[in-house]
Amino acid sequence: MVEVRHSRVIILGSGPAGYSAAVYAARANLKPLLITGMQAGGQLTTTTEVDNWPGDVHGLTGPALMERMREHAERFETEIVFDHINAVDFAAKPYTLTGDSATYTCDALIIATGASARYLGLPSEEAFMGKGVSACATCDGFFYRNKPVAVVGGGNTAVEEALYLANIASTVTLIHRRETFRAEKILIDKLNARVAEGKIILKLNANLDEVLGDNMGVTGARLKNNDGSFDELKVDGVFIAIGHTPNTSLFEGQLTLKDGYLVVQGGRDGNATATSVEGIFAAGDVADHVYRQAITSAGAGCMAALDTERYLDGLQNASE
């Protein structure tokens, strides 16, 4: 028989939004249950260096920051469960979440499931996934020590991946479909310095057309330039860094979405993190397509916990 566990508050996700919500909910004596999801710690576990977390003057790694957040949540007796939710039912209360290991019910839910790496959708990209194609330089970069690699993208993620790989690979070719990058100025300065050293090669106004390879894995990449011409690169690895997609497919048909993101109430009158179903709140990248920073996610997690506390207090007062 499948175990059914009930909690007043369940938090889905273990990134900055989830752990921040857990700290505040636990301090409010709501005894939250946090379900980690498949990637415990969220996107930051794949980030090498976090230099903009206030108070950490010398910076720290993403995994180290997430470990500290986990410890902080556990200090206030947040129960953390390593499970993956594959179905939800918000049609009736208590809300039901079905996981791989158990079934969970709750009076209130905070969704902090974050976002996942986006891919180009090329057949060759999928064919060589795990055989030379990756979306995480910190996870897979060590396989390419002293080997040539390519990074695709033009934002912060792409530049950060290229800078990281420049310390490992023989050369890094950064492929961007435009003439200029969208990354932060400090990252652009670092990028230009590595370009001057010859460690990073810029290939602008070009798109990845096909990943080339054989039975052993990736051997190259074919690029289509904006003028219609083609070039080929000899690389052993291709890293895709073109952004992320919110992890909301689980909630389609049950919560209101816009462009894949959960719609929250917003505003300055409280209940800003409320979704289209009462008692269900959202925080972090799952509801934010603009800022998408660790610190804004953590702040939204705090807001969601406070909104949840007020919601549960209202339920309790109504029943008395």
From Swiss-Prot:
Name of the protein in question: Glucosaminate ammonia-lyase
Annotated source species: Pseudomonas fluorescens
Annotated PANTHER family: THIOREDOXIN REDUCTASE 1-RELATED-RELATED
Superkingdom as given in the UniProt entry: Bacteria
UniProt record similarity statement: Belongs to the class-II pyridine nucleotide-disulfide oxidoreductase family.
TM segment ranges: none
UniProt miscellaneous comment: The active site is a redox-active disulfide bond.
UniProt EC number: 4.3.1.9
Cystine crosslinks: 136-139
Keywords, sorted A to Z: Disulfide bond, FAD, Flavoprotein, Lyase, Oxidoreductase, Redox-active center
